[in-house]
Amino acid sequence: MLYEDNTEKEVCGYEISGFDNMKVEPQTVTVTYKSYDNLCYNYKKLRGESMKVNYNSTIRSCFIGYIVQAIVNNFVPLLFITFQSQYSIPLSKITLLITINFGLQLIIDFASAFFIDKIGYRLSVLIAHLFAALGLISIAILPDMMNDSFMGIFISVLLYAVGGGLLEVVVSPIVEACPNEHKDKTMSMLHSFYCWGTAGVVVISTIFFNVFGIDNWKILALVWAAVPVINGLTFLKVPIAPLINEEENGLSLKELIKQKAFWGFLLIMCCAGASEQSVSQWASAFVEKALGISKSIGDLVGPTVFSVLMGISRAIYGKFGEKINLYKMMVFSGCLCVLSYLMVSFSSSAIVGLIGIAVSGFSVGILWPGTYSDASTSIKGGGTAMFAFLALAGDVGCAGGPTFAGKIAGMLGDNLKMGILAATVFPITLIITLIIMNLHKKSLYNTKYL
């Protein structure tokens, strides 16, 4: 930073010279992570540096950030049966951990709209990685240290849920802020890493348990904890661009909620989350029946197949997105999702049902990241609050979709196929909302909807 006598010669890692000829009134400023990031961004912009090259490291760190989120969401559920036998914890209490994890993430989604802009993205993403690492480390230590093993697991889940919730809110806008010609492609590729992370956690953990034994799960927990630790350290150095440039006026929360498009995107996001999870949770059952494998293997293969297909969908758009119209892609994906639901609901063949599960995973891939990109393009100055509430809407859909499908199935004699058929209301609502917003944009602005 610069001192009053201009003796400091370095800003953001660059040598500075020529201050003797500059007429600058010395002043004392308070530097925070947020102001320092903005200073670095504006200084590099003044130098005319290549922003694409400079921000590759930032984007890579964000990709790994989504792998961290996949770790905290998917590793511990693999240990539920182990917790039940090792610590004599009732299964009813163990399944409560899922509700705690995603419930706290919902709270973080909402709360982050009010504090992230105040502390800045760098500090926020560092805190997210810290809590994720602490949660994974503590789950290997606290259950044996505390008299009540469940409380040790409970505290650990609370810790990594804070990290997971923050990561979901901050990583996407950090990538969105990076100067890039095709931000929708990058956003889709970013979200594909959650899918690869999910598949990787399941496959690597399964291999570890089979080679070294399930009793050594604590060692693996510490290995997974190294990922947020190492990636968190990279966020100390990578450049972070401001989501809203200084010359732009960001929308206040009151101004944001007055935007009709904002509410449309919230509905789309909620439907995207519901469409993704309504079938995802039943993937294991269809895989077990179609392939004639055990439940334990099916519980691993089903979610992996779904995640891999979803990741492939996002990676394809991430690679060829500049040749694909996002609006048409999302409408097509919604229609494909409806078709996959019908395959699962009406087919008497387990193989066709399995194909329907795979098609469902592929179809929902673009919906979540596509909504992020479209909202950012359409609502200028939406900022952190917009991303936070979009994440909240998506998580509400993820929780509500399977619940709705399960309730309908229960009312019809535990007929899961009919529950999934009823869940077609989510992709259908998504399609209708997309079309209405497209027509609305054309009539107001005489421009194409993406």
What residue ranges belong to the model's regions?
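Extracytoplasmic gate region of multi-pass secondary transporters
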Residues: 76-77, 260-304, 308
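Helix-to-loop junctions at the C-terminal end of transmembrane segments
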Residues: 108-121, 313-325, 409
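Helix-loop-helix hairpin linking two adjacent transmembrane segments in secondary transporters
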Residues: 189-240
